[in-house]
Amino acid sequence: MGKDTIANIITSIRNADMNRKGMVRIPATNITENIVKILLREGFIENVRKHRESNKDFWVLTLRHRRNRKGPYKTILNLKRISRPGLRIYSNYQKIPRILGGMGIVILSTSRGIMTDREARLQGIGGEILCYIW
């Protein structure tokens, strides 16, 4: 049984968001770096910094929480892993699903790297659907 790093980071972010934690630490790999850049660019996280501890690199993510009178509430409503090691899901650019009518994002792994559904549609390429965020 292998490790599924994408499921691990999605679960870490979801758990920290549900418990209203301000920060979450995830292992730094090339895949997680690309996903973190997308989350930062799309506004789901506030800040990212790289942390080195005992010869291992980690990303420390600052989650974005909005404040109201009762306290902070979460911004990321849901993260869902779609393609997994036991069942890969692929889509061409015409059949990439739209999440909440375009309000959410789909993260894809394409031949040109990891990107969002909007970027893949603009470039006219499909790929493996990694996760939904809405």
Swiss-Prot record:
Mostly located where? plastid
Q: Which GO terms describe its molecular function?
A: rRNA binding; structural constituent of ribosome
For this protein, the record's InterPro entries field holds: Ribosomal_uS8, Ribosomal_uS8_CS, Ribosomal_uS8_sf
**Which processes are annotated in GO (biological process)?**
translation
Gene Ontology annotations for the cellular component aspect, listed alphabetically = chloroplast; ribonucleoprotein complex; ribosome
Kindly list the places in or outside the cell where this protein is found, as annotated in its UniProt entry.
Plastid, Chloroplast
- Which keywords fit this entry according to its UniProt record? Chloroplast, Plastid, Ribonucleoprotein, Ribosomal protein, RNA-binding, rRNA-binding
User: Matching PANTHER family, A to Z?
Assistant: 40S RIBOSOMAL PROTEIN S15A
Q: What does this protein do?
A: One of the primary rRNA binding proteins, it binds directly to 16S rRNA central domain where it helps coordinate assembly of the platform of the 30S subunit.
- UniProt family annotation: Belongs to the universal ribosomal protein uS8 family.
How it assembles, according to the record, is: Part of the 30S ribosomal subunit.
What is the protein name for this chain?
A: Small ribosomal subunit protein uS8c
Provide the species name: Cucumis sativus (Cucumber)
